[in-house]
């Protein structure tokens, strides 16, 4: 830095950068207001900057321009978008029409005649808006309950035995090992005879 007459030159605009407005990145100096993505002009900081040669980008634009090409452009599920990067000079590939490979309705009758699957508990038709799959079978949301206590279940909290679904507590009491505690842990010890 010169002793008199200002500071280093900004890597973006070329003007003098004084200490109070200085941002340093990759050995270069920038004005705070010039430390912007080369494409979208977003303000950058040390956690959002990505450098390519002498150019600075936000991580999103850098990924679109230099990252792997494909669904989501490698940014993670939280930032998926439909921007194909045309303004970066990226030529979009011609889109192929989507053709589903399988019908999500597994019932052969339903596939052939357009009907709905039957609920494993009540036997009535289960339509997509109210369908839950548990133990590999369709259920109404209201029927997706423990067969013993009636507690609502989730696909991660159920256990299945002989085609019926149970909460973990009822399953342990009715089908688990018999004896001290019924297999529920020390907090629920009960002596069985």
Swiss-Prot record:
GO biological process terms, semicolon-separated: muscle tissue development; myoblast differentiation; sarcomere organization
Cross-linked sites for Glycyl lysine isopeptide (Lys-Gly) (interchain with G-Cter in SUMO2): 91
Domain LIM zinc-binding: 10-61, 119-170
InterPro entries assigned: Znf_LIM
Keywords associated with the record: Acetylation, Developmental protein, Differentiation, Isopeptide bond, LIM domain, Metal-binding, Nucleus, Repeat, Ubl conjugation, Zinc
In-chain residues carrying the UniProt-annotated modification N6-acetyllysine: 112, 131, 137, 161
Positions where N6-succinyllysine occurs in the chain: 137
Motif (Nuclear localization signal): 64-69
GO molecular function, one term: actinin binding
Its job: Drastically down-regulated in response to PDGF-BB or cell injury, that promote smooth muscle cell proliferation and dedifferentiation. Seems to play a role in the development of the embryonic vascular system.
Subunit structure: Interacts with KAT14. The LIM domain 1 is necessary and sufficient for this interaction. Interacts with GLRX3.
PANTHER family, sorted: CYSTEINE AND GLYCINE-RICH PROTEIN 2, RHO-GTPASE-ACTIVATING PROTEIN LRG1
Protein name in UniProt: Cysteine and glycine-rich protein 2
